[in-house]
């Protein structure tokens, strides 16, 4: 059975939650597939989500990095969701608040069984900071595939861009195919089609495809 293409333009806001406990209170259960977006507070997560869904304000962007403190959930369909995790690592955020965010991120990655993939966004000019590597390690420990998305790729010339992409791929080479690395620009649309292809693949794990097919058979 060939997998259908998810229409990411249909994404709609579902809920916000300050931590995993509140998330579990609002969701119908740890079911379906969630794809999480994580990154430093100035990595461009909100802009990336808006571009990928063709919606100008699905995820709120802020000129003040660190403003987004909640876990925000967007529904694609009854079985699939996108998750905008709190930005991490911004220097001007109070230490206590920064610690709380990191605890929420850790809890989410360790406890959500439906997490089917994680996009770690990094400024292509400053990739692989300590917290970026920690997020990647957390995901891989939970056997979650990772897309390292090098944002703001339009800031570099083509040759410089590919040089940085190759350097990051080499650095993450020990993880084999569990980590994909792609350049991306919300401003110029660089990498959009490639990213949507990866997300679509993550949205179709075999167990979910089989479950949907079984449900359709029972309804006939």
Curated annotation (Swiss-Prot):
Residue ranges annotated for the EngB-type G domain, each copy included: 31-205
The UniProt record lists the keyword Metal-binding: yes
Binding site for GTP: 39-46, 66-70, 84-87, 151-154, 184-186
Cofactor: Mg(2+)
SUPFAM superfamilies registered for this protein in UniProt: P-loop containing nucleoside triphosphate hydrolases (SSF52540)
Organism: Shewanella sediminis (strain HAW-EB3)
Record flagged with keyword Chaperone: no
Alphabetized GO MF terms: GTP binding; metal ion binding
Residues that bind Mg(2+): 46, 68
Keyword set, alphabetical order: Cell cycle, Cell division, GTP-binding, Magnesium, Metal-binding, Nucleotide-binding, Septation
UniProt cross-references to InterPro entries, sorted A to Z: G_ENGB_dom, GTP-bd, GTP-bd_ribosome_bio_YsxC, P-loop_NTPase
Free-text function comment from the UniProt entry: Necessary for normal cell division and for the maintenance of normal septation.
GO BP, one annotated term: division septum assembly
Protein name: Probable GTP-binding protein EngB
Family per similarity comment: Belongs to the TRAFAC class TrmE-Era-EngA-EngB-Septin-like GTPase superfamily. EngB GTPase family.
GO cellular component, one term: cytosol
